[in-house]
């Protein structure tokens, strides 16, 4: 029976002698979720996922049960399972830990998906910089295959033939977008597709395809092993289970933690078992949630906020990838955003003009503020550019560029207006 504050995804870490050894994995409930899954009907498996209310852990927070049910009813005799392990989000390192320290949990989740959808092939698209982790994961795949959990007639079930292949990325952030990732697997340029159609209908090689994040796949065996209701009760009504969070920035205890959804944000930031408060002794100023594309929140306004999907959404924030970057009051938010904008300008794939040119113009404008060279017209120009890029970009990268900028503008307008006001004053007075 699961208990609140009991780790589910990090429970084996530090206990197993070898992260890739199947026998060690099985000592700690490994493959119990798969064994229960094959004892259930397809509808019972889907019902457990619906009850668990696991939201996708890659950032979009789409209910996993709905996604799996969509694929289950999709037309097509060939279906593919794809794990998105292209973890390129700055400030996010949770998938890296799961892949290196408990790879068999991810493999088990992918096998359960393969069983449910009668898939023959699964792919894990792993960040190119994770060369060492790719070797570890390949060793885990080989061991699982040798133990009879991959290959032909898995667990003695006639016709249950399924295997997983590692695909290495080449360091492009845009390939974290699911359709761009599938294009890359197919050997094409990693650029997003036009939607619809949904990937569950027309995905890899134009066949129905399931794409889930590493943490999402690792959570599936827990749901099947413990039951959807038990998983739901570990979180909140709007999002079950626990969430891996990555604490970084001006915070004392930087690192990876597993928290129950619904944990007070103040406890995460200041509690000694988690963040431990400011590392510099200065007051904490703002938090960047969910990766570079996530919104920014002021610490002072979040004292009563819970770390849950519904509560963060109510504050115009988001869980996103689980990244939590904390900055103290020595940081000017414009200085911080210049680095965020530079990241987006560099990683834009260039397919659509609004993102290709818009991210560059946003960086140029923020750099003007940063150099104290902005004029009174630059602030409305920046706001207009943010709106255009959001509305006209073809994929989620361009559509989310404005989130940190707009939230920072709303919270700290004085830090953007200072240089513009200085310009007006200097002009009206004829110089200093």
Model-predicted regions and their roles:
Residues 60-68, 92-95, 134-139, 175-187, ...:
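Short acidic, glycine/serine/threonine-rich loops at helix termini
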Residues 1-46:
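Cofactor-/ligand-binding subdomain signature composed of acidic, glycine-rich
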Residues 30, 51-71, 113, 171-183, ...:
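Conserved phosphate/anionic-ligand binding catalytic regions in large, soluble enzymes, centered on
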Residues 25-31, 83-95, 199-204, 246-251:
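Gly-rich Lys/Arg/Thr-decorated short loops/hinges at beta-loop-alpha junctions or inter-strand turns
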Residues 32-48, 77-79, 85, 94-99, ...:
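Ferredoxin-type iron-sulfur electron-transfer modules in oxidoreductases and energy-metabolism complexes
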Residues 134-261, 279:
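Hydrophobic alpha-helical positions that pack around
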Residues 102-116:
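Histidine-anchored nucleotide/phosphate-binding helix
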Residues 109-113, 260-279:
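Short amphipathic, charge-patterned alpha-helical segments
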């Amino acid at each position: 029976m699961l208990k609140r504050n009991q780790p589910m995804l990090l429970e084996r870490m530090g206990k197993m002698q070898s992260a890739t050894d199947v026998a060690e994995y099985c000592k700690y409930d490994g493959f119990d979720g798969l064994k229960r899954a094959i004892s259930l009907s397809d509808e019972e498996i889907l019902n457990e996922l619906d009850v668990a209310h696991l939201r996708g852990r890659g950032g979009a927070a789409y209910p996993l049960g709905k996604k799996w049910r969509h694929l289950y009813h999709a037309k097509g005799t060939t279906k593919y399972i794809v794990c998105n392990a292209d973890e390129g989000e700055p400030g996010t390192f949770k998938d890296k830990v799961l892949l290196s320290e408990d790879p068999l949990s991810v493999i088990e989740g992918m096998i359960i998906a393969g069983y449910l959808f009668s898939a023959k092939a699964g792919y894990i698209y792993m960040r190119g910089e994770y060369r060492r982790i790719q070797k570890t994961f390949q060793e885990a795949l080989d061991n699982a295959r040798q133990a009879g959990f991959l290959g032909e007639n898995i667990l003695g079930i006639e016709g249950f033939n399924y295997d997983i292949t590692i695909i290495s990325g080449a360091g492009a952030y845009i390939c974290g977008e699911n359709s761009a990732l599938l294009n890359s697997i197919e050997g094409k340029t990693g650029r997003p597709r036009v939607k619809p159609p949904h990937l569950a209908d027309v995905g890899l090689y134009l066949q129905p395809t399931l794409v889930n994040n590493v943490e999402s796949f690792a959570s599936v065996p827990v749901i099947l092993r413990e039951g959807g209701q038990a998983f739901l009760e570990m979180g909140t009504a709007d999002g079950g289970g626990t969430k891996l969070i990555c604490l970084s920035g001006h915070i004392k205890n930087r690192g990876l933690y597993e928290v129950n959804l619904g944990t007070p944000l103040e406890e995460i930031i200041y509690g000694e078992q988690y963040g431990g408060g400011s590392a510099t002794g200065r007051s904490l100023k703002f938090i960047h949630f969910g990766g570079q594309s996530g919104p920014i929140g002021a610490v002072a306004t979040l004292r009563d906020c819970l770390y849950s999907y519904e509560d963060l959404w109510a504050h115009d924030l988001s869980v996103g990838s689980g990244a939590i970057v904390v900055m103290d009051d020595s940081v000017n938010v414009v200085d911080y955003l210049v680095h965020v904008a530079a990241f987006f300008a560099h990683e834009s794939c260039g397919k659509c003009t609004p993102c290709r040119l818009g991210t560059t113009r946003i960086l140029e404008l923020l750099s003007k503020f940063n150099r104290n060279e902005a004029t009174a017209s630059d602030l409305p120009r920046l706001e207009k550019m943010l709106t255009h890029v959001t509305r006209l970009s073809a994929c989620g990268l361009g559509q989310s560029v404005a989130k940190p900028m707009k939230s920072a503008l709303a919270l700290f307008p004085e830090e953007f207006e200072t240089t513009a006001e200085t310009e007006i004053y200097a002009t009206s007075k004829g110089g200093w």
